[in-house]
């Protein structure tokens, strides 16, 4: 359950009070035990839980053995970082409805758990459906399950998020 301060944050961001209940979204607590797994595409260090980090690194190595390069775009995100992503999009003129189709509200992102990764590969634009046409996506579809990862947001998912072929979680 969200604390009063996060309920206030949701109100301040314009997130409807019934957002999570209408979409049947689970609340995710912030992970506290995190380890670094390397920088993302823009050099920002990414972190995951120790278990997720181990599985991610083993998966990246296995993919590399098959000549597939998996790049991390985003791992753990705090509630505050998630709120900042939304603020930036609001400032750029997006509506909260548009934003919430792509970004979960603070408290409802799998990234809070430290067990979700947004994946990219050379030759495909990060965080776009274009990723589904990559060799990396095909490799993940065939192999990610061996490492405990699955694609969370397929087309027409029940939570109302856009199709995210780049988002994989334990």
Name each model-derived stretch.
Residues 1-75, 79-170:
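Extracytoplasmic cell-surface/polysaccharide-interacting catalytic and binding patches
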């Amino acid at each position: 359950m969200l604390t009063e301060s996060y309920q206030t944050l949701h109100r301040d961001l314009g997130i409807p009070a019934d957002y999570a209940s209408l979409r049947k979204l689970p609340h995710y607590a912030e992970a506290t035990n995190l380890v670094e797994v390397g920088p993302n595409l823009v050099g920002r260090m990414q972190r995951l839980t120790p278990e997720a980090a181990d599985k991610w690194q083993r998966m990246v190595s296995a993919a590399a053995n098959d000549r597939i390069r998996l790049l991390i775009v985003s791992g753990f995100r705090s509630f505050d970082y998630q709120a900042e992503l939304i603020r930036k999009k609001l400032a750029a003129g997006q509506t909260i409805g548009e934003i919430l189709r792509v970004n979960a509200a603070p408290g409802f992102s799998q990234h809070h758990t430290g067990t979700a990764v947004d994946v990219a590969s050379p030759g495909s634009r990060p965080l776009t459906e274009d990723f589904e046409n990559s060799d990396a996506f095909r490799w993940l579809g065939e192999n990610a399950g061996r490492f405990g990862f699955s694609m969370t947001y397929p087309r027409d998912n029940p939570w109302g998020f856009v199709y995210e072929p780049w988002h994989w979680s334990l």
